[in-house]
Amino acid sequence: MVNQFDLNAARAAAERMVTLPPRLVIHGEPGIGKTTFGANAPGCVFIKTENGCDALGVPALPVEGVCETWDQVLQAFDAVLEAPEGVQWVVLDSLNGAHQLCRQYICDRDFNGVWTSKRGVEGYNAWAAGDKASSMEIKRLLAKADEVRAANIGIMMLGHTGLHKQGDACGADFYKFGMDMEPRSWNFVLQWADQVGHACREFTTGKRDGENRAKATMMNSDRWLVFDGGPSRDAKCRAGYDMPAKIILSFEEYQSKLKSPSAEVLRGQALNLIADSSDKVKDIIKSKLAASTAAEVKKQISTMSLQRVQTMVNWLIANNNAEG
């Protein structure tokens, strides 16, 4: 029996460790291309709670219609586990729909189908009891997805964007983009996922002469998948599953970046961000790296640790956004 606290055994286990496929979660507005993104994944099988993939010619469960109960969603994952040959990606479309089926399941199981409390009858919405129970069921879904992932199958969960109220200990509360689902359940998904991307377009806001309110104008027709999270959106990449701050919303683009070495992707991103920065920012970088030329900066970055490059990229993004 292996001593679980044997350092030599830990080193040997680390050398044998194989990186599993990513757990990718994407939230975005309806119609932006999330389902098309998933359908372009090789060896994909959809689990449907809505019929967005019907015209795309991809295998999907259930064969006809969509999952109508929470148990059917879990059963679909079991079906993949029973016949995993040829499956490279499982795509849940959508997580919002699965979450609503989960809530209905809890309401029927624990509250006899009563959503709103009445005199002497406690409903799903009483003291958030229903949502708390639902979040535990969402953890059950994530565990089921991990069983599939252990068979070397990537997990992709798609859903619609909503607004989540975020508390701020140092100022006024604010809203941020995230999956349109109950916050407790969404937080469990956020913690579980290796990558969370926000599918969106780029907008600019401004007031025209004589107008009192600013209007949003789409900058171009490009659709992006943003992995750089912050106060405005929930997005992230776990170490080992690093991606650029944003990529074109295309599975081919995603796959090409995913295959690149993490450090190489970050170093290239850092150099691109520096090239697009103001002279002031470039001077700060040169000073920090004790470099006098762009070539010396590039050489320094090529030998940096992954963590240090990531810190630089985050700083450059924040400064470029502030200046822009």
Residue map of PLM features:
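P-loop NTPase motor core
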Residues: 97-185
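Conserved GTP-binding G-domain of TRAFAC-class P-loop NTPases and closely related GTPase folds
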Residues: 166-273
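Structural motif
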Residues: 25, 89-91, 156
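Short, well-ordered beta-strand core segments
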Residues: 44-46, 155, 196-198
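Interfaces that engage single-stranded nucleic acids at replication/repair/recombination sites
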Residues: 2-9, 16-23, 28, 32, ...
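Conserved nucleotide-sensing/catalytic segment adjacent to the nucleotide-binding pocket
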Residues: 54-116, 128
